[in-house]
């Protein structure tokens, strides 16, 4: 069983990436389980075609002793099993707690033994790698971590923070960084910036997602690109990324950048932004 986490700054395209990778793997005959660990609970929306009840919602309504696997696991496109951890009510509690509760409940209900997935994907918010959101790293629930980023300074800053978390917990177990997934949906499209960042922390850019209005159109209809436009170039891009991740053996403990090194990257981005304005 392959298990990996996808981290990244909020709004960076994690859920789009995860849902399309899951759809591509399912299309290839893999049995896939996706666990959405973002309080927005929208990771699996395009797989199922709607938002599903979250583990925390069901937990609050039924209580742990009355919960069943079918209350929290829903089947989506290609037979992908979908779970959403959910989050607390606004202004109350810790969002990361949903991750802990979801994973505990999946284990308690024997989800992994009953579903027997070939691949488990955790989609995790990465703006702040707090205790809850870092749980998959702490508990070694996954083998590999992939980080989605654009070339925006704050996205790279968040990616660097995630690398600090990976390095902290890698010494205690098997968790490692599998690579960076570059998303081209930014003010400027500068893959060389992200390639340079990846090289400096000691990893690879395992996939590049170009800007595509097909992604937006698919999401309007609550579908993955794999389902909505299976013959499109962007669908093939997601298939290539899914294959690269599934077959990847290039796992490293990253070397996070210093503040000075991050500033150097930010200065390069600033130059590119000024050039784009002149152009």
Swiss-Prot record:
Cofactor annotation remark: Binds 1 [4Fe-4S] cluster per dimer.
Keywords, ordered alphabetically: 4Fe-4S, ADP-ribosylation, ATP-binding, Iron, Iron-sulfur, Metal-binding, Nitrogen fixation, Nucleotide-binding, Oxidoreductase
Residue numbers carrying ADP-ribosylarginine: 97
Transmembrane segments: none
Coiled-coil region list: none
A GO molecular function held by the record: metal ion binding
Keyword match ATP-binding: yes
Post-translational modification: The reversible ADP-ribosylation of Arg-97 inactivates the nitrogenase reductase and regulates nitrogenase activity.
Positions annotated to bind [4Fe-4S] cluster: 94, 130
Role played: The key enzymatic reactions in nitrogen fixation are catalyzed by the nitrogenase complex, which has 2 components: the iron protein and the molybdenum-iron protein.
Subunit architecture: Homodimer.
HAMAP family the record matches: NifH
Protein name: Nitrogenase iron protein
Taxonomic source organism: Methanocaldococcus jannaschii (strain ATCC 43067 / DSM 2661 / JAL-1 / JCM 10045 / NBRC 100440)
């Amino acid at each position: 069983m392959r298990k990996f986490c996808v981290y990244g700054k909020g709004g960076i395209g994690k859920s789009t990436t995860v849902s399309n990778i899951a759809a591509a793997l399912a299309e290839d005959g893999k049995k896939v389980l996706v666990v959405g660990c973002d309080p927005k609970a929208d990771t699996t929306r395009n797989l199922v075609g709607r938002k599903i009840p979250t583990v925390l919602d069901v937990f609050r309504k039924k209580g742990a002793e009355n919960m069943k696997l079918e209350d929290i696991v829903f089947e989506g496109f290609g037979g992908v099993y979908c779970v959403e951890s959910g989050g607390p009510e606004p202004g109350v509690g810790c969002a990361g707690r949903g991750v802990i509760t979801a994973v505990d409940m999946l284990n308690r209900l024997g989800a992994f033994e009953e579903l027997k997935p070939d691949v488990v994907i955790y989609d995790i918010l990465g703006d702040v790698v707090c205790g809850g959101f870092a749980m998959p790293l702490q508990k070694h629930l996954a083998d590999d971590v992939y980080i989605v980023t654009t070339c925006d300074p704050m996205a790279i800053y968040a990616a660097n923070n995630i690398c600090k978390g990976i390095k902290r917990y890698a010494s205690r177990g098997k968790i490692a960084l599998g690579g960076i997934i570059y998303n081209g949906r930014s003010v400027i499209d500068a893959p060389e910036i992200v390639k340079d960042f990846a090289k400096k922390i000691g990893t690879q850019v395992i996939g590049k997602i170009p800007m595509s209005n097909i992604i937006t159109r698919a999401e309007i209809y609550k579908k993955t690109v794999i389902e909505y436009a299976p013959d499109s170039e962007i669908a093939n891009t997601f298939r290539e990324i899914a294959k690269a991740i599934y077959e990847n053996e290039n796992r490293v403990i990253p070397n996070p950048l210093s503040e000075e090194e991050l500033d150097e990257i930010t200065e390069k981005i600033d130059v590119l932004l000024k050039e784009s304005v002149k152009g």
